[in-house]
Amino acid sequence: MIIVTGGAGMIGSNIVAALNAEGHDDILVVDDLTDGHKIANLADLSIADYLDKDDFLTRIEAGALGRIEAVFHQGACSTTTEWNGKFMMEVNFAYSKRLLHACQAPRVPFLYASSASVYGGGSEFREEPALERPLNVYAYSKKLFDDYVRRTVFDTDHSQVAGLRYFNVYGPREAHKGAMASVAFHLFNQVERGENPRLFGAYDGFGPGEQSRDFIHVGDVADVNLWLWKRGSSGIFNCGTGRAQPFRAIAETVIDTLGKGEIEFIPFPDHLKGSYQSFTQADMSRLRAAGYNGQFRTVETGVRDYVEWLKAQRSS
């Protein structure tokens, strides 16, 4: 059995889809379906079972789930604007620690979601503690778990443990995320409503729409997860493309693909000032050194593919 926590979420469901494509369907999805809209992400996928996240943790700690091939731990509170630190630490840190230890004794491969948000406002994006400066409680919860893994696992005899620091992920199966869905998703919907796509104006030394991130298609993220599992590599790895591109490039690709719209700039929101990453670009040296030679989609290619997927979903 393969377990995917957060399996009804964006990245988790795309990992399930990638596993299905390789012939795996003995998959246990773990999630919190209080928001039942996430079921749409699983409707076209093949899984063997589902467990609520709390029931699952009790059962795996008791050794009651039988033979497990791997755990892809994608479940988390990923709302970067959430400032309830108690809730965030319980969900992202305490839960992850318990699951990590439940996987160690039976030597179950454990691949988990970290985040590029741990780098905060820094200008270098390598997997080194000195470069990690989280700007919000979400980022801190992710950094703290990475530090815990470094301190308690990597210097011991351990089963595979791999953390993937996701940069800006976009692509299919993210509609349930609402405000936290990708910029590509929101710009597509704005244009489809007959509005102009809106981007932030000048901020933090960047011109209008020129704030830049390392945008990675969720299909490429799923590919990296499966490759690492098969490779058996342990460590903390950046998961981006290695190339920063401006938000303007996303808007231009949406406009070009849909054949309508004109970029409109809005003032940078006050509530994001001081906790916003204006630039990210993954240093991919560690993942490449581990042997990964897969290619990553550019914004122009990946966003075009995504917009076509969204159009097909609308018409179906």
UniProtKB/Swiss-Prot annotation:
Its EC number is 5.1.3.20. Coiled coil: none annotated. GO terms for biological process: ADP-L-glycero-beta-D-manno-heptose biosynthetic process; carbohydrate metabolic process. Substrate binds at N168, A179, H186, F200, G201, A202, Y203, R213, Y276. Its cofactor is NADP(+). It comes from the Bacteria. Binds 1 NADP(+) per subunit. SUPFAM superfamilies: NAD(P)-binding Rossmann-fold domains (SSF51735). It catalyses: ADP-D-glycero-beta-D-manno-heptose = ADP-L-glycero-beta-D-manno-heptose. Keywords: Carbohydrate metabolism, Isomerase, NADP. Contains a large N-terminal NADP-binding domain, and a smaller C-terminal substrate-binding domain. NCBIfam families: heptose_epim (TIGR02197), PRK11150.1 (NF008360). Homopentamer. Catalyzes the interconversion between ADP-D-glycero-beta-D-manno-heptose and ADP-L-glycero-beta-D-manno-heptose via an epimerization at carbon 6 of the heptose. This is ADP-L-glycero-D-manno-heptose-6-epimerase. It comes from Mesorhizobium japonicum (strain LMG 29417 / CECT 9101 / MAFF 303099) (Mesorhizobium loti (strain MAFF 303099)). The gene is hldD.
